[in-house]
Amino acid sequence: MLEHSLRTGVPTAEKVLAGGVWGYLSSNPEASRIFDEAMTSKAYGQVAGVVEAYDFSVFRVIGDIGGGRGHLLQRVLMSAPAARGVLFDQQHVVEQASGVRSDRLTLQAGDFFKGDLPVCDAYLLMEVIHDWNDQDATKILRNVRSAAPAHSKLLIIEAIIADDPGLSWPKTLDLWMLAIGGKQRTCQEYAELFANAGFSFTRQIDTQAGVSIIEGIPA
């Protein structure tokens, strides 16, 4: 079915699933549960690499946007003992994450396409933006920007496509993402997304876990 996407540019998921991948998951709780568990398991090694590569202790309030069951935010808060965290995701996802709630970690249900995001010092989006095309990704980031204080930082965590012609895992993943309507991006493409959404790119921090942290600040 990938051939359909390669030939037409139209996500295969929209052809075989009503509402595409995300519409299907939102209306099928069991499928959503399995998907969230799979993403949590896959991300364990990546999360360790992210926490090792970045100093989160400088933030007071850290928002994990589209954070699933909170595995990233939990580890980040362990590395930043003075910080509080806000886990932001759709209602059906947040309900499955109730076990991570604590005096330092609160849950907020919402839709990042509609806004109403929490006010934080740092916004984490781990493997969220690659799920969406440029138009939708820009809309998400603009909604983050609407909530973001002037001093805050935006931290996008993704596998980045290098500017070279060689084979790589991010390029292979890019084909998979095509089937659901998303894409992997180069650092320059993220910088352009940032600019279109009201952020300025500051730096790329590579980790030992196959993902990079793309940092930005409000423009």
Regions found by a protein language model. Name each.
Residues 52, 56-219:
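Alpha-helical subdomain
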Residues 1-60:
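Conserved Class I S-adenosyl-L-methionine-dependent methyltransferase catalytic core
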